[in-house]
A protein has these predicted regions:
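C-terminal ends and interior cores of transmembrane alpha-helices
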Residues: 83-103
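Extracytoplasmic
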Residues: 11-43, 128, 158, 248-256
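Juxtamembrane intracellular "pre-TM" segments in multi-pass secondary transporters
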Residues: 1-10, 205-234
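Hydrophobic core of transmembrane alpha-helices in multi-pass small-molecule transporters
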Residues: 102-123
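Extracytoplasmic gate region of multi-pass secondary transporters
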Residues: 30-34, 158-159, 223-259
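Helix-loop-helix hairpin linking two adjacent transmembrane segments in secondary transporters
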Residues: 137-138, 143-203
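Central cavity-lining transmembrane alpha-helices of secondary-active solute carriers
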Residues: 50-70
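Cytosolic juxtamembrane N-terminal segment immediately preceding the first transmembrane helix
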Residues: 1-23, 39, 100-101, 105, ...
Length: 259
């Protein structure tokens, strides 16, 4: 009897790695934009931090998006997330350009970045599961490590992108934003189109195959994941970590300036 051959998912895996890179890039770019926005839009420190408020406020939609994913599937959520990211960046390009010279330009910028953030939330729901299923199970840990490494590389590249493409020795003005954001929007839509036309496995496939065993073992587990104390401790730890990850790069430049 011949062994079942694992399909070659190299190309889809590369695309998903690009998505992981994009998640880290956009998230760090958002933090790196705060000092630029404060000067370009003439903001106070409090107003500048609205960039983070609007972006990370989108994560409250993670549970509704997870429910949506269970209905439309992983691939549709992945494509939709990239499409929303692309629309958000392009809307930022069009909206900021249209609102230049008005008091509403910063509000338009924030609203469009919140759209981008909604897309990023969708991508974070599905990226890691796809990394795990796009290849042999025994190399899943390696793929996951590589995807997180790319995410970390993106956090280094994003500030360089901001300084060389958006700032680049030019005056810090709102009109410097639309061009680069249009490029990012088009790039996200191109990746979405590629993923739409390629075949991807369902990360829930193994779960469905093992449903019988899961039912048999159900009595070993509590009725809800929230009944496990370490889930709450884990959530608290992540919240504290995010406060450090976001707070330090967002606040430190202002601290350096005043000191």
């Amino acid at each position: 009897m011949s062994q079942k051959q694992t399909p070659n998912y190299l190309f889809p895996l590369i695309i998903v790695f690009i998505v992981c890179f994009l998640i880290g890039f956009i998230t760090t770019m958002n933090n790196s934009m705060i000092e630029f926005c404060k000067e370009a839009f003439k903001l106070t420190d409090t107003q500048g931090q609205l960039v983070n408020t609007f972006f990370y406020g989108a994560y409250f939609f993670s549970i509704p998006f997870a429910m949506m994913m269970s209905k439309i599937g992983y691939k549709a959520t992945l494509v939709l997330g990239l499409t929303v990211v692309g629309i958000g960046f392009i809307a930022n390009n069009l909206g900021v350009t249209a609102a230049l010279g008005t008091a509403n330009v910063y509000t338009v910028f924030l609203c469009c970045m919140s759209i981008v953030a909604l897309g990023v939330v969708m991508l974070q729901l599905v990226a890691n599961p796809y990394v795990m299923v796009l290849g042999k199970p025994e190399s899943g840990a390696f793929r996951m490590t590589l995807s997180q490494a790319l995410n970390s590389v993106a956090t280094t590249v994003a500030p360089i992108f901001i300084t060389t493409v958006i700032i680049a020795g030019k005056p810090k003005l709102p009109e410097n934003v639309p061009g680069p954001f249009l490029m990012l929007g088009i790039f996200a839509l191109v990746i979405a189109a590629i993923l739409f036309f390629i075949k991807l496995p369902d990360p829930d496939m193994d779960k469905k195959e093992d449903e019988g065993a899961a039912v048999a073992d159900a009595q070993q587990y509590k009725s809800s994941v929230f009944k496990y104390p370490h889930v709450w401790f884990g959530a608290l730890a992540i919240a504290m970590y995010m406060g450090l990850e976001i707070g330090i790069p967002s606040m430190l430049p202002a601290y350096w300036k005043c000191c």
